[in-house]
């Protein structure tokens, strides 16, 4: 993780699952610029390990607390991997960030699932 914690990539029953845990582009505006730039590079380095990997189901942070840089981690993830289904996480109940992201990135509408409430159930 670029913060604290772990991320998981596993294969089960011929499917690949990725759970980012706390691996994200943690670009906090109150941190020094050198720290923020380092976080971007660390995140890219970790995500590049999965370059072009076909991932069937992914769980990736889309954290509104990051404000204007909230999209950065998911953008980098989508550019470097080939996920089939992505569930944004770390939304802190502010699920409208998913719609906002998709309005900015319509090319991902088929892959990123809309979450409307906690406990929502999906069939994949």
Where are these regions (language model features)?
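Binuclear metal-ion centers of metallo-dependent hydrolases, dominated by the metallo-beta-lactamase
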Residues: 49, 70-124
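Active-site glycine- and acidic-residue-rich loops that bind
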Residues: 1-2, 65-67
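Active-site-adjacent loop/helix micro-motif of nuclease/hydrolase catalytic cores
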Residues: 29, 68-70
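Core dinuclear metal-dependent hydrolase active-site scaffold
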Residues: 1-54, 119-124
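Active-site neighborhood of phospho(di)ester-bond hydrolases with catalytic His/Asp-centered motifs
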Residues: 18-22, 35-38, 57-65, 84-92, ...
């Amino acid at each position: 993780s670029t913060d604290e914690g772990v991320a998981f990539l596993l294969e089960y029953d011929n499917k690949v699952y990725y759970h980012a845990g706390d691996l994200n582009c943690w670009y906090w505006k109150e941190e020094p610029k050198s720290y923020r730039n380092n976080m971007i590079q660390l995140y890219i380095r970790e995500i590049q390990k999965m370059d072009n990997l076909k991932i069937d189901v992914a769980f990736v942070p889309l954290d509104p607390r990051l404000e204007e840089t909230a999209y950065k981690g998911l953008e980098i993830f989508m550019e470097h991997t080939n996920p089939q289904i992505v569930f944004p996480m770390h939304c802190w109940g502010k699920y409208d960030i998913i719609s906002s992201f998709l309005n900015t990135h319509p090319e991902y509408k088929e892959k990123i699932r809309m979450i409307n409430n906690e406990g929502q159930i999906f069939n994949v």
